[in-house]
Amino acid sequence: MSFFFKRTFGSINKKIIKSFRKIVEQINALETKMQSLSDEELADKTEEFKRELKNGKTLNDLLVPAFAVVREASRRFLNMRHFDVQLIGGMVLHNGMVSEMKTGEGKTLVATLAAYLNSLEGKGVHVVTVNDYLAKRDTEWMSKLYNSLGVSVAFITNDLTDEERKEAYSADIVYSTNNELAFDYLRDNMKFSREDMVQRGFNYAIVDEVDSILIDEARTPLIISGPVEENNQIYKHIDKIVTKLVDSDYEVDEKGRAVFLTEDGISQVEELLRSYNLISEKSSLYDAGNMIMTHYIDQALRAHKLFTADKDYIVKDGKVVIIDEFTGRMMEGRRYSDGLHQALEAKENLEIQYENQTLASVTFQNYFRMYNKLSGMTGTAATEAEELRDIYRLNVVKIPTNVTVKRIDVDDEIYGTEKEKFNAVLKFIKECHKRLQPVLVGTVSIENSEKLSALLRNHFLRHSVLNARYHEQEAYIIAQAGVPGNITIATNMAGRGTDIQLGGNAEMIAKVELKKIKNADEREKKYQEIIERVKRDKEIAMKAGGLCVIGTERHESRRIDDQLRGRSGRQGDPGLSKFFLSLEDDLMRIFGSDRMRSFLKRVGLKNNEAIHHPWINKALEKAQKKVEARNYDVRKSLLKFDDVINNQRKVIFEQRNHILGNEINDLFEVYSEVNKSVMESIVQGGYYEDYVEDIAKEFHIRYGITLDKKDLAKFLNKQEALDYINGKVKEFFTEKEKYFNGQQTTDLWNTIVKQVMIMTLDHLWREHLSILESLRQSIGLRAMGQKDPLNEFKREAFLIFECMLERGKELTIHRLAHFKLVDNQEVGGRLHPTRKDNLPKVSRNDKCPCNSGKKYKHCHGAVTVMN
């Protein structure tokens, strides 16, 4: 973040907080009045606010009384009163900004203020969480508050049916994950009926852990895909070839996440490919006919040299499951595209699944920008404030803590090797454990968490491990990390959304320990014992120094490190944070500067000796800033390309919705355009009368109608002939409509037209996405010809899109013209377009029939080649 931006950001932040404090005073002034209301009178306020909105008041006009009502309802039904700083957080959310609040400051409670106020409009509010557990937990927890005010609330998780989802989306406030919301959007736009759609629009979203969702996951598109049958054995053969390569056969670029074959490597691969009869004796790897082999080789190299088991993915139940690099969570159901997942399956000797074709996709960047109003909450957003502002138009406001943070952040310790580092971590944990100080150790991978776990076991130190393998116990493990003497090892996921309370979480403990007790009196007695025990344990933990957070490696992003530190020192509790690093860590090895390396060599590191130096801390921060800046540039570049696709996606989805929501009996506009296009492609620049026979033949193939050549020859120009043809085609479709509507179902033709239009549009859109993805991957080479790849992509994507729309009209009319019912005796029998499209054969070097001016092989012919 630039000095200027920091300075500006700081001054604006102060002004916003100052202006909101004045509104807090107005809310506080209503507290006594709200406390005097009965439960019924408090609930009646919701209807009163709705009436005032109808009478012309705005949500801003109602903010003060609405926030006062929510605070009082929370005090009564949740036994929690919003602090003044939480009211400020609620105002930040309502104003479409990001509220940065430290861990333990009650973000879940803050969201209720803005959610309630915005629900009064009746357009729906989405509260977005990072996992199903939090969506369900927050709904159940906050439902007492919402229900007491007559506001409906629901949650959406991945196990709900479409009917249940539709009902949930109709609630005033909906809690769900970012994945569920975006996938429901894609699924809705693949439905064949509006009644089957589950969502009801994009009014207002509050995104919890906004940095994780809008930044960390921004590069990953959400894809709904279907399998494409192919010969999967090729992946097995290529995997065997790649495992035979030696270090001199390839170069690994860890920064750019790429692997390249050397000259020796190319020769070796060609020799091995010939031995498997995958290429001919005389051909080379880069011959036109063998280009697909380079794709398989590239993916196999990436699978072996860039992707590590238990770090980037794990093998579970015979499947490769991706691990989110930022959260450490398993991403079940997600697969890498472009054959990479198949390459990993071959590497791990698993059954290879079919490669998938994209049916629909969207990025979180473009999904969340569809909301009329967007806001977010997180404990760490300041480092990414510039990106949130530039891409999402979200300003970040740092909310003051309710109590001053007392956590001590100690300088990093750097060791020569990973082994020395882990030994130092072990020694430090022992010291903390001796004084009963609770310890949370953060690791960047499952591999490291299990390595450290084995080390602790060897020294008889009891501990809990939290990583993608054991994510089911996440909430309980992390909630008990504050118990005196407890040692918890966690990957980056670190239980975001679950508070670490010193002494332990009484509610969580009670949920587990009271399960088997049936007697009400005994349950109450046991519950009181738990409360007392937690109180005593909190005192012990505080005397020991509070929660000690240990980082075993710096992450690429400072924000992830800050999130780990932020687990300690909640609500004014004491705490400590310290990072232990080694020269073998990824960040030091890949991104550390030459200056830092030479400095460390000069200083010299003896066995088990650590370096403490403020300059090293600054150098590390500089390396992290470099990586953050690079990642931001990547995300910004991807967004520019995705915006092109997103604009086309909007057009397609709007067309789809228009088709689903309207009666479509008159096809004149569609077929008249198609007929004009066909006429132009036949006549081109020649004389109309020279092509009468070709015209009659072409339209007979397309519609099965016979055009009198003598009649056609009478016309003076092609426009007159076109009017005549359109009239004949109109008669043809009128007869077809009468026939189908006479099959006991009066509006069958309209249904047929809609279904064919939708199926054609979906089919072409799938092919279009595939073509655009190939174009995007290759367009970077245009830079070598002094052309801007983005402008080239925009230009070509537009031409291909126009071609696709024209092709859609042509294919729709053709399919409708040849449409038949499977069985006329079945009322509304299965609709069955004839499988073969009898359109005229086009040579690959001819101009494309869609009139784009491009050769067929570079336009619609590309679809055939790709598939």
From Swiss-Prot:
GO terms for molecular function: ATP binding; metal ion binding; protein-exporting ATPase activity. GO terms for biological process: intracellular protein transmembrane transport; protein import; protein targeting; protein transport by the Sec complex. Its main location: membrane. It catalyses: ATP + H2O + cellular proteinSide 1 = ADP + phosphate + cellular proteinSide 2. Keywords: ATP-binding, Cell membrane, Cytoplasm, Membrane, Metal-binding, Nucleotide-binding, Protein transport, Translocase, Translocation, Transport, Zinc. Its EC number is 7.4.2.8. It is a peripheral membrane protein. It comes from the Bacteria. It is found in: Cell membrane; Cytoplasm. InterPro entries: Helicase_ATP-bd, P-loop_NTPase, SEC_C_motif, SecA, SecA_CS, SecA_DEAD, SecA_motor_DEAD, SecA_preprotein_X-link_dom. Its cofactor is Zn(2+). Part of the Sec protein translocase complex. Interacts with the SecYEG preprotein conducting channel. Has a central role in coupling the hydrolysis of ATP to the transfer of proteins into and across the cell membrane, serving both as a receptor for the preprotein-SecB complex and as an ATP-driven molecular motor driving the stepwise translocation of polypeptide chains across the membrane. This is Protein translocase subunit SecA. The lineage of its organism: Bacteria, Pseudomonadati, Pseudomonadota, Alphaproteobacteria, Rickettsiales.
